[in-house]
Design a protein with these regions (language model features):
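Active-site histidine-anchored catalytic micro-motif
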Residues: 1-158
Length: 158
């Protein structure tokens, strides 16, 4: 099974936005693992489909869907596409894993995946991520110095 995490560029209110809908690719559809979707969704404290509309125009998992279909063709495993919002609305000064509701959800989700692995299922976590967008092209008026690059890299690695 594949858990695909992508950036939710529109940053909906939900920290993670799941969808049970398949992703269409030129190589065929990426099917959702419905029992796993239900197990993951049941561990969240909110409706994970509340912001499902974010999947419609989001590009952060499109390449991953095509890549998975290309690699495995007819044997492509089912997946769970999850868009990840900004966590700053929950806390601007703490790591997301230290926010109580997020910490509990991460532990619960980890337990669901561990249970699947204990049943002999292979688990792949695939990230479609963006790193820092800095510079004039992104509206910044600052000079990109080696010191700033090191700081940005450090922030990207958190």
């Amino acid at each position: 099974m594949v858990i695909a995490l992508g950036v939710a560029h529109v940053s909906p209110d939900s920290p993670w936005t799941l969808t049970p809908k398949r992703y269409e690719t030129p190589l065929g559809a990426m099917e959702v693992d419905e029992p796993l979707y239900d197990a993951l969704a049941s561990k969240l404290w909110y409706d994970p489909r509340a912001d499902e509309w974010a999947h419609k125009n989001e590009h952060s998992l499109e390449f991953q869907a095509v890549w998975l279909k290309y690699l495995w063709r007819e044997k492509t495993p089912k997946w769970i596409p999850i868009l990840v919002s900004s966590f700053e609305r929950f806390s601007s000064d703490e790591a997301p894993s230290k926010i109580p509701t997020i910490e509990k959800a991460l532990k619960d989700l980890g337990n669901v995946l561990r249970s699947e692995a204990d049943k002999g299922r292979s688990v792949m976590i695939l990230n479609g991520i963006d790193l820092a967008h800095v510079g004039p092209r992104f509206g910044d008026e600052l000079e990109l110095t080696p010191e700033l690059e090191k700081k940005i890299e450090s922030e990207d690695r958190k």
